[in-house]
UniProtKB/Swiss-Prot annotation:
Active-site residue numbers: E50, D61
Underlying gene: trpA
Metabolic or biological pathway, per its Swiss-Prot or TrEMBL entry: Amino-acid biosynthesis; L-tryptophan biosynthesis; L-tryptophan from chorismate: step 5/5
Naturally occurring in which organism (per UniProt): Rhodopseudomonas palustris (strain HaA2)
Protein name in the entry: Tryptophan synthase alpha chain
Complex formation: Tetramer of two alpha and two beta chains.
Keywords linked to the UniProt accession: Amino-acid biosynthesis, Aromatic amino acid biosynthesis, Lyase, Tryptophan biosynthesis
Primary role: The alpha subunit is responsible for the aldol cleavage of indoleglycerol phosphate to indole and glyceraldehyde 3-phosphate.
EC number(s) given by UniProt: 4.2.1.20
Length: 278
């Protein structure tokens, strides 16, 4: 199968530049603002969009993304409404890849077959499910692949040579390398260590490797993108959004623009990695 993710990475390879991947939480702080933000991301420079599925117990997420998920849940965002959000985004954008990221529990409750059918129909291209290891591939990974969705696996600094082949076995779309040990937003990525890790992963796979966790500035994005096939930014965008909210955590006129401006500056940093390599 060829997905929008595959097409986008092939395009980026022809252009000789890394991908800029943005993460936002579905329904944060409300569904209408969330849709406006999604529509603004590609124009600002996002090559791939990851959309968080709000969940009550997000164990891998730091304070910023946890708070975003709670705002979304309090605003009434459900997994069904998250898929509707993707469908609404697709009415105006048929090309930007969309990856849903989150935890297995809401999908299990929704029903795997129903979720995969509805996700595919909405225009979802891939899934990142952080609490499903390769040993559980039969639960969701293999059915997702059969449904035509990429299943993107996480590799970490603690994923050793013995474990890596299992992690990569049924991965498609790209590999998401978590550059730090710990929760999101908790530290800065070390570009030298990242370069070594990406090289190690690439000895085992031809898939693109994108690096996330710990990227907050254009300079940081540029340094990481120079070592990988893409850079992922989430917590910094969530922080920028949160700073524009009113005292009741409602969106203001500044909300979408503030995030889009940061995306544009980070995207320029990622594109600077291409120029530095030339």
């Amino acid at each position: 199968m060829t997905t929008r993710i595959d097409i986008r990475f092939a395009q980026l390879k022809r252009e000789g530049r890394p991908a800029f991947v943005t993460f936002v939480m579905a329904g944060d702080p409300d569904l209408a603002t969330s849709l406006q933000l999604l529509k603004a991301l590609p124009t600002a420079g996002a090559d791939i969009i990851e959309i968080g599925m709000p969940f009550t117990d997000p164990m891998a997420d730091g304070p910023a993304i946890q708070a975003a998920g709670l705002r979304a849940l309090h605003g009434g965002t459900t997994l069904h409404k998250t898929l509707e959000l993707v469908g609404d985004f697709r009415k105006d954008d048929a090309t930007t890849p969309v990856v849903l990221m989150g935890y297995y529990n809401p999908i299990y409750i929704y029903g795997v077959d129903a979720f995969l059918a509805d996700a595919k129909a909405a225009g979802v291209d891939g899934l990142i499910i952080v609490d499903l290891p390769p040993e559980e591939d039969a639960e969701l990974c293999l059915p997702a692949m059969k449904a035509g969705l990429n299943f993107i696996r996480l590799a970490t600094p603690t994923t050793d040579e013995k474990r890596l082949p299992a992690v990569l076995a049924n991965t498609s779309g790209f590999v998401y390398y978590v550059s730090i040990t710990g929760i999101t937003g908790s530290a800065s990525a070390d570009s030298v260590a990242v370069g070594d890790a990406v090289a190690r992963i690439k000895r085992h796979t031809d898939l693109p490797v994108c690096v996330g966790f710990g990227i907050r500035t254009p300079e940081g994005a540029r340094a990481i993108a120079a070592q990988a096939d893409g850079a992922v930014v989430g917590s910094a965008l969530i922080d920028a959004l949160q700073k524009t909210l009113d005292t009741d955590n409602r969106a203001t006129q500044a909300t979408v623009g503030a995030v889009a401006d940061l995306v544009a500056s980070l995207a320029a940093g990622v594109r600077g990695a291409q120029q530095a390599a030339e």
